[in-house]
């Protein structure tokens, strides 16, 4: 079976990850002790993708949990599904990374990384045919960003032909936890551009807006935000876990979404948006789902797709529905909004249909888009980075851990290159004259 190994790192990653497992367990009918109590044989058909079946009939998540301090792990362990994980798969240090990327990547994290890799190896050997890894982390702190990217590069070295998918929470423009977020995020993006295959970009501010505007929650908690993220994660991976009429795996997803290797940062969205605890009474139709899913307000990162163009997009519908209707709706969206899609990639929207809806819903859909407007996120982080780096503010925390200023400069220019690549393809046209291409060749020579 095509297994996926899940890794969560740092406080944010562990909290999102714990929520994700609650959702996936519920969908597969697995209770908090790992026993199956579901009523549908489809729940078990591909349960091996995320679970290992132990000899006693219990299902154990293929998950590795890591952090540089024990706090978050303890709360995962004492949480609703804390007892389902393999105890050996909790790997943690005592010192913490103090929101410092260098501590996570070079000093504290580097000391712990081997024990994490041992667990990863053990889990990978347990797989029949591992298709890839998914990593949950944030880019603003120290552990998820620094140690997370260190682990990704080590895994890349050891398993070069396996897919690497990340769910990365970017620092938000208005909601900031720490002042050095732009440093940590830029250094992380520098790594993710090179070592990850697909990055789902999330961001707390966009999630706050969804909770506030759409779900009408006056004071959204992290629990509410994580509820949205886990719904999306479950949607992104549903066609890997359940049989469906049009299925995909991590590699097919990448092939359909990534026209150029560096441009692998995706926006995600989910429909119908429901808050925790509320159930929807009215079943949505496929056209309504499609409309809500493409809505800019539904995107879980602070970039507006209307400011750019879609290179590619992929939609995953869940529930009993006709594939014909899904295809018609998707074509309809493309025809109505043709200016928002690049014309030099024909048929750039793919859809998959999976028969099993999420718990409590009749139908749902998840959206993954590769839009050039994601450059807004990178631009914003880059501006904040430059403002501080120009004055060398807070730099001693990083150089004190053995980092060099050169690394900051490289990360900054890599991020700026990424932004200009997105811009270049946003402006590109499908002219037949060939003039376009000559220009691009010149650009290539200069670089």
From Swiss-Prot:
Oligomeric form and interacting partners: Dimer of alpha and beta chains. A typical microtubule is a hollow water-filled tube with an outer diameter of 25 nm and an inner diameter of 15 nM. Alpha-beta heterodimers associate head-to-tail to form protofilaments running lengthwise along the microtubule wall with the beta-tubulin subunit facing the microtubule plus end conferring a structural polarity. Microtubules usually have 13 protofilaments but different protofilament numbers can be found in some organisms and specialized cells.
Cofactor: Mg(2+)
Gene Ontology BP, a term: microtubule-based process
Record key words, sorted: Cytoplasm, Cytoskeleton, GTP-binding, Magnesium, Metal-binding, Microtubule, Nucleotide-binding
Functional summary from the UniProt entry: Tubulin is the major constituent of microtubules, a cylinder consisting of laterally associated linear protofilaments composed of alpha- and beta-tubulin heterodimers. Microtubules grow by the addition of GTP-tubulin dimers to the microtubule end, where a stabilizing cap forms. Below the cap, tubulin dimers are in GDP-bound state, owing to GTPase activity of alpha-tubulin.
UniProt GO molecular function: GTP binding; GTPase activity; metal ion binding; structural constituent of cytoskeleton
Location(s), subcellular: Cytoplasm, Cytoskeleton
Protein name stated in the entry: Tubulin beta-1 chain
InterPro entries: Beta-tubulin_BS (IPR013838), Beta_tubulin (IPR002453), Tub_FtsZ_C (IPR008280), Tubulin (IPR000217), Tubulin/FtsZ-like_C (IPR037103), Tubulin/FtsZ_2-layer-sand-dom (IPR018316), Tubulin/FtsZ_GTPase_sf (IPR036525), Tubulin_C (IPR023123)
Annotated GTP binding sites: 11, 69, 138, 142-144, 204, 226
PROSITE patterns: TUBULIN (PS00227), TUBULIN_B_AUTOREG (PS00228)
The organism of origin for this protein: Lupinus albus
Keyword DNA damage: no
Family designation: Belongs to the tubulin family.
SMART domains attached to this UniProt entry: Tubulin (SM00864), Tubulin_C (SM00865)
A single GO cellular-component term on record: cytoplasm
Binding-site residues, Mg(2+): 69
